[in-house]
Amino acid sequence: GECFFCKKGFVNNCTDQNGGWALGCRIDGGQAEYVRVPFADQGLNKIPDGVTDRQALLVGDVLATGFWAARISEITPEDTVLILGAGPTGICTLLCVMLHSPKRIIVCEKDASRLQFIRQHYPQVLTVQPEECAAFVRAHSDHGGADVVLEVAGADSTFRLAWECARPNAIVTVVALYDKAQTLPLPEMYGKNLTFKTGGVDGCDCEETLRLIAEGKIDTEPLITHTYPLRRIAEGYELFEKKRDGVIKVAVEC
């Protein structure tokens, strides 16, 4: 909480070796019965009365990622917002985009079970598969493309799809992590005058997201489709990795 970046709210860029991304990356994480958290006075938030552990489970991440992505995307009530990817992070991004009440939201996802999840829980959201996305967005936007695009998929083709589906002067927020370098074809993009926003989540809004959960404005519980005890955590990992049984997110009980 004392370095330049922490004081600016950019806590993921903390310059201390035990700050920022340390927990679960450079030091042991939270999948244990007891956890030691450096700088806990800065990095932990009290769960409000009336909010269960299960309701709060996704606040630190991936809800923090979705909230940050929606916040920096400058969404207005007149916007058409396209979200690429309907995995756990994509759905959390959707929940936080909905807080800004844009004119319409389109979710693009290739997995049929995840598309069905979106249709079942958020019927007001338009859905489309990647091969139809560009034409669908043009047909369902007011200015030839999405006003805001949030790239949450991280597939080989989704970065290009993101800027192709954006209207001129749109905002493209890249939330996804990629396995390899992406090409930025500047000659093709030049006339679109796009604004790109990228980077890791600054988990500094957890107190606000907990308040929104307490007020009933965010509900991530439907994302927790499976629960395992800590002694069977390897089974939960395998289920999640192989995307079996319609899994979205797995909870671990200690």
Task: Map each language-model feature to its residues.
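Mid-domain Rossmann-like dinucleotide-binding core that forms the NAD(H)/NADP(H) cofactor-binding site
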Residues: 46-131
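Glycine-rich cofactor phosphate-binding loops and adjacent beta1-alpha1 units
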Residues: 73-77, 98, 103-106, 115-195, ...
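Conserved acidic E/D residue at the C-terminus of a beta-strand in Rossmann-like folds
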Residues: 109, 176, 200
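Rossmann-fold dehydrogenase core element
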Residues: 171-173, 184-223
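A general structural signal for well-ordered alpha-helical segments in protein cores
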Residues: 32, 44, 63-66, 90, ...
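Glycine-rich phosphate/adenylate-binding loop and adjacent beta-alpha elements
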Residues: 1-43
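C-terminal hydrophobic helical "lid"/dimerization subdomain
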Residues: 110, 135, 160-164, 203-254
